[in-house]
Amino acid sequence: KEYRRQRQMCIRDRTYYMPSYTAPVEDMMFLFEKLRNNQKYNELEKYKEVTSDLVKDILQEAAKINQNLILPLAKVGDENPAVLENGVVRTPPGYKEAYKKYIEDGWTSLSCDPKYGGQGMPKTVSAFFDEMLSSASLSFKLYSELSIGAYNCINHHATDDIKNKYLPKIVEGKWSGTM
């Protein structure tokens, strides 16, 4: 609550308090180990190759991109919000390049089905990434949120023809969900 109040004052007064964020990778790994044992991930065929070392590597890379690339965008987005000009939405400076890196590095596909180009990680792993992304820059995270919703809706309710047409494009970040 206090952070939010300070941030609103800084925005209003045109000063800026630069937030810091250190992803809690060790805490996340502790939770993953507990869930892995309780949920028996290692007994599920689709998660046989999901080891603690692999998850730790993923989370460490996720921490780097969120701390080094996404976190600085929080200030940029606050000072230069998205605008609608002549029917075209202009995102804050740096968002387009960051989103391109975000999709190139495969962050859109963490828990998506490998059948459609996803990595097939447990939802727990993508939840950890989402927590990091939300903490680094909630406004940036919201750019991908509609795509996650569209993916889940199509994956759970559409015919195979629709899934085959739309899901690979959503997973690779070429298409996104809209409202």
Question: What are the residue ranges of the model-derived segments?
Answer:
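Internal maturation/activation junctions in enzymes
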Residues: 146-147, 158, 162-179
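Amphipathic, small/basic residue-rich leader segments at the start of a protein or domain
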Residues: 12-142, 161, 165
